[in-house]
A protein has these predicted regions:
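N-terminal secretory signal peptides that target proteins for export/translocation
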Residues: 1-4
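Bacterial N-terminal signal peptides
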Residues: 7-18
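Flexible loop/turn segments at secondary-structure boundaries
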Residues: 20-23, 174-175
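Alpha-helical cap/lid subdomain in secreted, periplasmic
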Residues: 31, 88-235, 241, 245-264
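Residues at alpha-helix caps and immediate loop-helix transition turns in enzyme cores, especially N-
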Residues: 51, 84-85, 239
């Protein structure tokens, strides 16, 4: 065999490992990034309306940003159902890596009828039952699941990718009765806790933690500083900061939750 022919035979053997190595730096860069906390939820977590702020924005300042990234992927008007059906969760999953974290808080937009024009209600509870409904927004048939099913789906998907899932009960509204904040302990707060337990996820009872904090502060201050004059659901910056602090309080109280190790002292 001539030297020229021998060189042609060896060329593919040389090129294949070289081209494979060329792709490694991009993959390595992706794998070597800081652990990331992804936050998903509704407008009480992230809000673009003037004067309204969700807790998912100020909470980033409570983490050591030299050790973790905090990305708020919550979106106003979304429910546990529509965060999945609109493809928002799929985008989070595409970026999620082993060692990352997901905090989720849904519930405020999950009520109503399944064929409501906004197409966002889930079945009440945590069961596995389904119901066929026509999505009034898209005009398409849709299999609707329970609130708890959607939370378990998010937690299960996150865990399958090696990430840690934390489920929060929804923040309380500025609604009081006989000097006490109205809780969600008989519906979405309860169901969030049950879903976390069955999914093997961590649970922060944010509804209860914040309600107690509001009661300590007092109804007048809560109304004057933490909410808008005509809105009992969405918080001001001060309210969002207080709620973010309550999320951190809940994280610190969890046993063996690795996310707490990334908080500022």
């Amino acid at each position: 065999m001539s030297i020229s022919i021998l060189r042609l035979c060896l060329l593919p053997m040389i090129l294949i490992p070289t081209s494979a190595l060329a792709a490694e730096p991009a993959d390595a860069k992706r794998l070597d990034r800081l652990p990331t906390l992804f936050i998903i939820g509704d407008s009480t977590v992230r809000n673009s309306t003037k004067g309204q702020v969700g807790w998912g924005d100020p909470i980033g300042d409570l983490f050591d940003k030299s050790t973790i990234r905090v990305i708020n992927r919550a979106l106003g008007g979304r429910s546990s159902r529509t965060y999945l059906t609109e493809g928002l969760w799929e985008k989070v999953l595409a970026d999620l890596q082993a060692g990352d974290f997901v905090i989720m808080q849904f519930g405020h937009n999950d009520g109503g009828g399944l064929s409501d024009p906004r197409g966002r209600a889930s079945i009440k509870g945590t069961g596995d039952e389904t119901q066929e409904a026509t999505n009034a927004r898209t005009g398409e048939k849709e299999t609707v699941h329970s609130y708890g099913w959607y939370l378990r789906r998010y937690a299960g998907d996150a865990k399958a990718k090696g990430a840690t899932a934390i489920i929060c009960s929804p923040i309380p509204r500025n609604i009081w009765k006989e000097g006490k904040v109205a809780r969600a302990s008989n519906d979405y707060g309860k169901w969030a806790g049950e879903s976390a337990k069955s999914a093997g996820a961590f649970f922060v009872d944010l509804n209860e933690i914040i309600a107690k904090r509001y009661e300590d502060v007092g109804q007048k201050k809560v109304a004057d500083e933490y909410f808008g004059a005509t809105d009992h659901t969405h918080t001001t910056l001060a309210g969002a900061q207080l709620n973010a602090g309550c999320v951190v309080e809940g994280l610190r109280g969890l046993k063996d939750c690795p996310l707490a190790g990334y908080l500022k002292p």
